[in-house]
Amino acid sequence: MATYETFAAVYDAVMDDSLYDLWTDFSLRHLPKTKDKKKLLELACGTGIQSVRFSQAGFDVTGLDLSADMLKIAEKRASSAKQKIDFIEGNMLDLSRAGKYDFVTCYSDSICYMKDEVEVGDVFKEVYNALNEDGVFIFDVHSTYQTDEVFPGYSYHENAEDFAMLWDTYEDEAPHSIVHELTFFVQEEDGSFSRHDEVHEERTYEVLTYDILLEQAGFKSFKLFADFEDKEPTENSRRWFFVCEK
């Protein structure tokens, strides 16, 4: 059987590396790191690519993810890069044991995987409690334009020597929600290919909803940007960035 490491390699292979450069650059512009203020928690850190970049930029990084298998790969990646990073297996819906941080990030639209706005609000409350005073929380989500106009009917196919991937996206029932159907064909040790199917459900909300949920969590202010730039969103922006201050 193909291992989870295989799937992680597939994910990493099809992920656009330039996005990590953009996330890093955006973060460095908006996280006021100092000698005494550099503790950073990365939520949904996955295989640790972004965690390593934060560490290389001088942050004291902790990465949190639901998947123990993903974290094993993240630990290997950090070790290979000679970066000291703590990785925690955990859920962003419960950060009570995660410690305190100056900064928290949650990228790659991971907030959109929460099942409803109640869970989104719960994540915001958990992050608020995990932040030191004047701490900063940055997250990105799909815009409603992305979920309503861009994603429905989206289809992406990738073929490589040892794997193939089919990715199709459809509109879901709830407002601003989508379903990604992914099929992997992964080469086994004997040369044959095995098929694996995944379904990913995502949902975003109007900016006003995020505004209310952040305020209810206790954040005193936030700034809204779009598409990795320090500019306000337009009606055609695809990714919203929230920079929130405790």
Model-based region annotation:
Residues 93-103:
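A short acidic, Gly/Pro-enriched loop at the edge of an enzyme's catalytic core
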Residues 102-118:
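A short SAM/SAH-binding and catalytic strip from SAM-dependent methyltransferases
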Residues 1-35, 37-46:
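Conserved class I S-adenosyl-L-methionine
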Residues 138-209:
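SAM-dependent methyltransferase
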Residues 48-94:
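Class I SAM-dependent methyltransferase SAM/SAH-binding core
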Residues 201-246:
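C-terminal lobe and adjacent flexible extensions of AdoMet/dcAdoMet transferase-like proteins
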Residues 121-133:
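A short glycine-rich, Lys/Arg-flanked "PGG" loop and its adjoining helix->strand segment in the class I
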